[in-house]
Structures are given as C-alpha cells and as structure tokens.
A protein has these predicted regions:
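ADP-ribose/NAD+-binding catalytic cleft of ART/PARP-like enzymes
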Residues: 1-20, 40
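Short His-Asn-centered micro-motif
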Residues: 1-3, 27-29, 50
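Short, flexible loop/turn elements at secondary-structure junctions
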Residues: 4, 31, 54-56
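Surface-exposed loop/turn and secondary-structure junction residues enriched for glycine/proline
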Residues: 9-10, 15, 24, 55, ...
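Solvent-exposed, flexible loop/coil residues
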Residues: 11, 16, 25, 29, ...
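Extended catalytic/binding region for NAD+/ADP-ribose chemistry, centered on the ART fold
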Residues: 16-41
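Conserved NAD+-utilizing ADP-ribose enzyme module
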Residues: 41-45, 54-219
C-alpha cells in the first residue's frame, strides 16, 4: 500500500468514499506501483508491505471471465464523480447502473483496474461516445498500471498482517509516476483515440440495442 506515512494497522471504515470502489484499503502486488502511489511532488512516500490469508474471504475479481469492462465502469460510476451533464453520458450512466450493477459491497476483497487520472478520462470518453468499447479496453492496458487489490470488509482487515515497509524517494518515484501517466496519455491519443475501426462498438449501440452482460460482443 502506497502512502505518505507508515501504516502498521490499517483502520477499517477509514478512507475516501469517492475512490474507485468506495471506502477500502487499496493495495497492489507491485511494490514499485506502491512507491509511485505513495510519493508526492514535494514529499517522500512508503510502500507498506503486508500478507493476507484469503481463505474464507469472498473475492470479487473483475477480470474473471464472467465480467466485462462495463462491470468495472459501472462500479466506477457509482463512486467517482463523472461529468454526466451531456444527455448521452447521463443516459449511459443510468443504463449501465441498471444493467451492469454488481453487489460489490458484499465482497471482502475486490480485484480490478485502478482509475488514475488518465484512465479515468478514458472511461469518461467512452460514456460520452468519443471512443469505442474496444478502444476503452485497450486504453486500460496502456502504461501497464496493473491491478489493485482492495480490502472492503472488517473480516479482510482482520486477516492482514504487516510485514514492514520500503521508503520511496520523491525525486525518483514522482518522476516515474508522472512519466507513466504521460506515456499512457500519449499512447492513447497517438494509438487509440483517433483510430476507429469498422464495426467498433460505441455506447450508443449498447444503449440502442439494450445490450446485456452476456452479449458476446462485450467479451
């Protein structure tokens, strides 16, 4: 877990409600990513290391075959603040939340993409009709941001054991964080955003055809 301080015992119920998956303890299996998340432009950070026993815990893996990128996006729409002032975006949000909603709050742990600033903008472009579903899926892999591992329940917190920490120097790791974000944005505009393909699936088609989660075009 990347932070600006050492966290030996995370507090259940503490955090920002408008994070990707709501209140929870956000972790990664990649220590370098944790260092990037922990630093700021003017302060060092820490990669807090833990281990967790997952037996008996309910894990919602949004990358499992039974889910689509729209399931992930719907959870994001429920928690993050999107600009849905445009009619298409408002209609898209309503349809996705009615059709692709998951009971994610009952899970002990959620595994899925992390929506850093650039990735959040990709999702916003999709619900506004600027990019296709294929482009959204490709864009989420740009910059190799990876997955986040989010503890949601008290039971999950009780299974967490602190192992130690590594210090992250701001001068080194903030530069890497900024470069990753810039790379993702550059690749997005160079490779994805303006490269429409015939047959691409846009949010307008998903709405018009009232597509459901089991539609093979979403796999």
């Amino acid at each position: 877990h990347g932070s600006d301080h050492i966290i030996e015992k995370p507090k259940f119920g503490y955090g920002k409600p408008y994070n990707d998956y709501g209140i929870g303890f956000y972790c990664t299996q990649n220590p370098n990513m944790a260092k990037e998340w922990g630093v700021g432009i003017d302060h060092n950070g820490y990669a807090n290391r833990y281990k967790i026993e997952c037996d008996g815990l309910t894990i919602l893996d949004l990358n499992a075959p039974g889910y689509t990128m729209l399931h992930w996006l719907t959870i994001l729409l429920e928690n993050r603040e999107f600009d849905t002032s445009a009619p298409l975006a408002a209609e898209a949000k309503e349809y996705l939340m009615n059709t692709f909603h998951l009971d994610y709050k009952s899970a002990d742990i959620i595994i899925g993409y992390r929506a850093d600033d650039s990735y959040f903008s990709f999702a916003s472009d999709f619900i506004n009709g600027a990019i296709s579903y294929r482009q959204l899926c490709n864009a989420m892999r740009l910059g190799k941001l990876g997955q986040q591992f989010v503890l949601k329940s008290k039971a999950a917190f009780e299974q967490l054991e602190f192992l130690g920490y590594e210090t992250a120097d701001s001068k080194e790791w903030y530069k890497k964080k900024a470069f990753r974000d810039q790379t993702a944005r550059r690749q997005y505009f160079d490779v994805e955003r303006n490269r429409r393909q015939r047959g691409d699936l846009y949010i307008t088609t998903i709405l018009d055809e009232e597509m459901k989660p089991n539609d093979p075009r979403l796999r």
